[in-house]
Amino acid sequence: TLFAAAGLGGEARIVGGAVRDWLAGRAVGDIDMAVNLPIQLIADRLRQIQHIKVINTGLAHGTVTVVDAAQSIELTQTRSDVATDGRHAVVEFQDDWAEDAARRDFTINALYLDAGGRLFDPLGGQADLAAQRLRFVGRATDRVQEDALRMLRYCRFSIDYNGAQYDKQAVEALRGFASLAAGLSGER
């Protein structure tokens, strides 16, 4: 793996949409990976590999993009949210995969695939995907208040996944916090 080539320990897992789409039998687009090592260490080591470009796309949030001739992959250090402002989070880096999953928006996006092809699904996202059920991770009201963009993502995913079963708690949260959408940028 790339980590072994860079002399890194730790673990990198594909996470989110790529895993979700693969499980759903859809074409996989962007690849995001969660990593349980300090992102600056990873970036520094990967920069030493010929033909690899590392872009600091969001170091404060633990994210870099790794680009080679074939593809680009976004790497983000495992983390938890310690504060939010309705759109952006203050994060704390850690190496607990379950905590990283708990900060994600939907159970179907809290799916991880390791280098051995093993699925890590701490929140039941695979079952939700199979049942075409769209659920927020934890309380829907908390997820929406943390990031208002999640309301739009809920609508998008419910359409993308063939009219996924509506979650009553989610619909109530969307109704209750609809005014937060006014604070989102126009391109969203």
Regions found by a protein language model. Name each.
Residues 1-188:
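Catalytic cores of the polymerase beta-like nucleotidyltransferase superfamily
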